[in-house]
Amino acid sequence: MSRHFFTSESVSEGHPDKIADQISDAVLDAIIAKDKHARVACETMVKTGVAIISGEVSTNAWVDLEKLTRNVISDIGYTSSDVGFDGATCGIMNLIGQQSPEIAQGVDRSNPEEQGAGDQGLMFGYATNETPTLMPAPLYYSHRLVERQAEARKSGVLPWLRPDAKSQVTFIYEDNKPVAIDTVVLSTQHNPDIKQEDLVSAVMENIINHVLPAELLTEDTKYHINPTGRFVIGGPVGDCGLTGRKIIVDTYGGMARHGGGAFSGKDPSKVDRSAAYAGRYVAKNIVAAGLADRCEIQISYAIGVAEPTSISIDTFGTGSISEERLVEIVREHFDLRPYGITKMLDLLHPMYQQTAAYGHFGREPFEMTVGDDTFTAFSWEKTDKADDLRKAAGL
């Protein structure tokens, strides 16, 4: 029997980098709600008392960027300088400019199916059958811990919590299957009047034991709750936040490879985002079809070129058919050109702020309505291709 450990981390919606991601995606949503064919690349920086919004946009839509930014910050829970940031009073700087026409000429086409990739690059998708969501267990439970932290804070279960938090979970694997949790780390911002011993017991009861299955916890499981002691100063006062700084948290927690491109603030013409979503869709359907226990797909592109420059698949020795045959089946059943991805996953809707905290993958698809627009968020998490893939594989 082989035995190893694997660790993943997550951060809360109040982490400075996640504030930036949520603002960038809120800007994207506001624009795409009015102009589905806008080109958006929005970058945000937050630091003590200020939010700087920059990037490139091509659209005729008007967005009240200041109001939008203030609402995002306040909704997260930053409503007072005592907490470390105040959405109502912080300074907001708008540095957004026009997209370069040289990029547009390489991407835009009269025939939309020939739309070129917005940049070169390589993207990965991954799935594993070790959790019901087909996500790696260490990341899945890390996300659930900080998601529960926000829920306990906002619902009043633990009203002395503040928005900034981080989690980390180490799993023990035996023969590549997760069997137990070795270590749990949870650091959460809090009001100054809560005692450390009270915080530890409340977090243990209302967050950790609320989220982590008892069968995965043992007498040897180690817990580090606010291991440095006080965590009163947090958010953008404690650290500068930037869009795109949590790409491993956003994806697979280090269990799969990453091409390096961030997601938030980018419209679907940017393959950094859309092709990574498509990669997850492909890998998840392969695993859901029973064609592999684990699957990682790499897709690559050249700027201005529609067809992927390469597609490769690794099933880590768990596949029921050859990887070469899997690539053939994927080419037959998935259109991985930029326009094809956008159409296949129905991406031209204002759904992206929903993705900007607690992971872009492993979430349940659900119906959203924004104005007159009704659509499915997290469409890349559907397993509607699994039966077709199984039949194509002859299983």
Curated annotation (Swiss-Prot):
Q: Where is this region: Flexible loop?
A: 99-109
Is-annotated flag, keyword Cytoplasm? yes
Keywords of the record, alphabetical order, are: ATP-binding, Cytoplasm, Magnesium, Metal-binding, Nucleotide-binding, One-carbon metabolism, Potassium, Transferase
Give the matching SUPFAM superfamilies: S-adenosylmethionine synthetase
Coarse class of the primary localization is cytoplasm
| Keyword DNA repair included in the entry's annotation | no
What does the record list as GO biological process?
one-carbon metabolic process; S-adenosylmethionine biosynthetic process
**Reactions accelerated catalytically:** L-methionine + ATP + H2O = S-adenosyl-L-methionine + phosphate + diphosphate
Q: Which domain of life is it from?
A: Bacteria
Positions that bind L-methionine: E56, Q99, D239, K270
Which Enzyme Commission numbers does its entry carry? 2.5.1.6
Cofactor(s) recorded for this entry are: Mg(2+); K(+)
Its top-level enzyme class, in one word, is: transferase
Q: Which Pfam families match?
A: S-AdoMet_synt_C, S-AdoMet_synt_M, S-AdoMet_synt_N
Purpose: Catalyzes the formation of S-adenosylmethionine (AdoMet) from methionine and ATP. The overall synthetic reaction is composed of two sequential steps, AdoMet formation and the subsequent tripolyphosphate hydrolysis which occurs prior to release of AdoMet from the enzyme.
PANTHER family to which the protein is assigned, alphabetical: S-ADENOSYLMETHIONINE SYNTHETASE (PTHR11964)
Protein name in the entry: S-adenosylmethionine synthase
Species of origin reads Colwellia psychrerythraea (strain 34H / ATCC BAA-681) (Vibrio psychroerythus)
Q: Which gene encodes it?
A: metK
